[in-house]
From Swiss-Prot:
One of its GO terms (biological process) is aspartyl-tRNA aminoacylation. It comes from Aliarcobacter butzleri (strain RM4018) (Arcobacter butzleri). This is Aspartate--tRNA(Asp/Asn) ligase. It is found in: Cytoplasm. Its EC number is 6.1.1.23.
Amino acid sequence: MRTHYCTDVTEKLIGQTVTVAGWVNSRRDHGGIIFIDLRDKSGLVQLVADPQDCKDALAIAETVRDEFVLIATGKVRARGEGLENPNLITGKIEIILENLVIENRSRPMPFDINDEKVNDEIKLRNRFLELRSKKSFDIFQLRSKATIQARNTLDELGFLDVETPILTKSTPEGARDYLVPSRVHAGEFYALPQSPQLFKQLLMVAGFDKYFQIAKCFRDEDLRADRQPEFTQIDVEMSFCNQEDVIKVAEKLIYDIFTKCGKNVPSTFRRMKYSEAMEKYGSDKPDLRFDMPLVDVIDIFANSTNEIFAEIAKDKKNNRIKALKCKNGDNIFSKRQMKSFEDYVRKFGAKGLGYFQMKEDGLKGPLTKFFSEADLEEIIKVTELEVGDVVFFGAGAKKVVWDYMGRFRLFLANEMNIVPKDAYEFLWVIDFPMFEVEDGRTKALHHPFTMPNVEKYDLDNIEDLEEIESIAYDIVLNGTELGGGSIRIHKEEIQSKVFKLMGISQEEAKEKFGFLLDALSYGAPSHGGFALGLDRMIMLLAGTDSIRDVIAFPKTQKAQCLLTQAPSAVDEEQLKELSIRIRKTVVDS
């Protein structure tokens, strides 16, 4: 039927007869001669319906409209002088129609597929039409290339591709599970996996040594621009390894994928301890495409006559006072703008935001009256201020200060337009805390199967659980967490201790994780691994701001598929088979 894709038709084929197929991108009638731009996945080619060559083809071309599906046969000829289109691969030739078939017609389009300003809801309701755009096809071609390279690299390194179950057991991994009711076991539920974590560990216990999977994962969590309820990750696990071994594999994999996709990236990445990332950048996923570190000034502010600062500075363990220098900020932002920045940080828990302006005769601003000349000079010194700079200050509980000052750092950089768009800055964040305590509850920062640094910490004799470090690592790219992993617990007694420290009783541990504890008692090897978020990786490679652009049929931020109207109600008979009854809540008006 088809002999060539549209962009395969070049000057080399002049004089030959070809058959192409695709969609009408545009149609133009020039005084009895009709020009059609035909589009397929490769691009565009111009068709010409001329009555001197084929009246039948012209008659059909007169009825053609945008997005009709055509099969066209004709002879390739060079375009006339001055008629070439340098913006097209096929811009030097055209196809003179000898036969034209309308394979299918199209209703008028609800939107222009190349108009990026179209309402998201309209595009998602007609996602199959949006996917016709060149931008969409290029993204999925990139995704396919990256996925194939991932498989090839891991295969070359001796990893075995193994599929793990989709219907599994509900276990606490942080987010809520998607539950699937069982018809056979009334009142019981499967859970869709948040990750293949436990199964890949069991494969290491089984002796598979090296495993990988392009895995579908599901999490019922609040959505944002870089999250979806179902997502894909490149999942990797290996036996008899340490952190260095795992990082080498991950760097090789990332390097190969990015190189295959035409990006120039280093083969090894810099590293930073979690504590340094939080103190210097207020984030465990810092964007290092620009500098602007946070500077600790709590000792200087301890001397302040401002009672609030002085009180905060008394507790250096739990509080922070951070300075953020804005280069040439005094010439970029007005006083009104600088005052408005306080509204921004208040959204993230800040109680205020102070600032100094560096003038020719020293620091100026409403806070200077609370400091001695010596302390003001010290602020200039530690923040390396020059005339025209502005320095902002955040003070309070350390986690709150880290969060809002880290966000403010990114906000300022974008306001100043100093973030290079075409740079790729990778970073390993290492030595994460094993636990975090919130509202009196102890949670694993990564997951409870991560190996704590037992060589450095005695789990039986520790007062502050948040001091315990784990052998965990995240890979960050341009301020986005691309993935992460850890060395796993491979001894049953350590896993039981971790559960106990988290407040999980022996009975609960046995009920939820008995299969894992059993497996660890049968000679489990040391093992570790990582997972890379494929969707996020493609989002960064493609330079798009939304993860929805890189998923063929994505959900909205309300976890709905507008195309298929999922989730949807099911009939009573189906519910009855599943022993489920929907309880309707009546709200009094």
